[in-house]
Amino acid sequence: MLDIRLIRKEPKECESRLQKKDPAISLERLLDLDKTVRQLKADSEALLAKRKVLSGQIHKAKVANENADALIQEVNTIADQLVAFETTLQEQEALLEDLMARLPNYPDEDVPVSPDKTGNQVIKGHGEVPTFPFPPKHHMQLNEALQILDFKLPAKTTGSGWPAYCNEGVLLEWALLTYLLNKQQAHGFQLWLPPLLVKRDILFGSGQIPKFDGQYYRVEDGDQSLFLIPTAEVVLNGFHSQEILNEQDLPLCYAAFTPCFRREAGAGGAHERGLVRVHQFHKVEMFAFTTPEQEEVVYQKMLHVVEEILSELQLPYQLSLLSTGDMSFTAKKTIDAEVWLPGQKAFYEVSSISKCGDFQARRSETRYRDAQGKLHFVNTLNGSGLATPRLLVAILENYQQADGSVVIPSVLRPYMNNQEILLPKTVR
């Protein structure tokens, strides 16, 4: 949520900044509504003040045994007016709040302006894109012999886009997750296994609704709806909603492992088959609450963790600064870590590290008290640390051998009983 006071003070500047994300944004309707709401409040306060004066006059008239019928009639008229004002005020405030809730976060000044991902800027590359002395296979082709993933059986039970891991695929997935969690803990992140369902107001607080309403799986629990989380960011942000934290306790750096649920899987087209885009996947998510002064230090810490993981896995990757048209609704700055997928012949995002400023904190009402006792909204940051499906794809495709086997990265072997290679089923 943005600060309405800044919008009132600098409407043209705010509109210009927002249009870098969405050129269609106009603040005219919002400003008109804000003016109407403030006028209604002023008129209501004036009527309340007048009623107070009249009530005093009625009291004096009664004490003096004077006729107060006209005064009483005027007070009754004011009461009716106040009821009408309150109804109108509630309606107008609801419209204003909805418009405010649909405005995205302002992008930082150093974010490239572009309507889409074509404006993203590669700011760092690491490792060489592999060349193979044989025709490299897509991970789905490798899986035909390895048999570590199954798409047919879960399609019967659940539908397309819901893969199942099997055999050594289960071990490799858990090896990855254990390695990722150990890495987060080593860097000082507090580990969590949070709930997978959240209330609607928690989705609102993290910025998922109202803009993306209807894109999340919902579970009915009596008269209450709960939502399956699209990322642990949602629930971690909600942990401290409507709280006042102490400045000396910041930053709070959390890392959570959860399954994540996305309804839009498959939107990338048939070429993104397999694990590249699915409805359910595992992810380790980093999340932090900071002061504005701590924000950049924690941001660099998150970037460092992601780069360390990809470097230790010896995967070729690049860092891309996202343009305004490719950033999320809540982010003011995002850097994507992208790994090379030989099967796609392209770099694919495995982690997004974002600064959100006080945008989520305003929606969630999360503040901190400084040493002087003054209250401020916290800043929030989030970063994938990391999502495993594409990471698994990257390992399978970059570590593949001519015979269809796949070498297991050395950092994962301790979590797989020191197994060094995945062999095709026919040679086991």
From Swiss-Prot:
The keyword Cytoplasm applies. SUPFAM superfamilies: Class II aaRS and biotin synthetases, tRNA-binding arm. Keywords: Aminoacyl-tRNA synthetase, ATP-binding, Cytoplasm, Ligase, Nucleotide-binding, Protein biosynthesis. PROSITE patterns: AA_TRNA_LIGASE_II. ATP binds at R262, R263, E264, V278, E349, V350, S351, S352. Its EC number is 6.1.1.11. One of its GO terms (cellular component) is cytoplasm. Pathway: Aminoacyl-tRNA biosynthesis; selenocysteinyl-tRNA(Sec) biosynthesis; L-seryl-tRNA(Sec) from L-serine and tRNA(Sec): step 1/1. It is an enzyme of class 6 (ligase). It catalyses: tRNA(Ser) + L-serine + ATP = L-seryl-tRNA(Ser) + AMP + diphosphate + H(+); tRNA(Sec) + L-serine + ATP = L-seryl-tRNA(Sec) + AMP + diphosphate + H(+). Belongs to the class-II aminoacyl-tRNA synthetase family. Type-1 seryl-tRNA synthetase subfamily. Consists of two distinct domains, a catalytic core and a N-terminal extension that is involved in tRNA binding. NCBIfam families: serS. This is Serine--tRNA ligase. The lineage of its organism: Bacteria, Pseudomonadati, Chlamydiota, Chlamydiia, Chlamydiales.
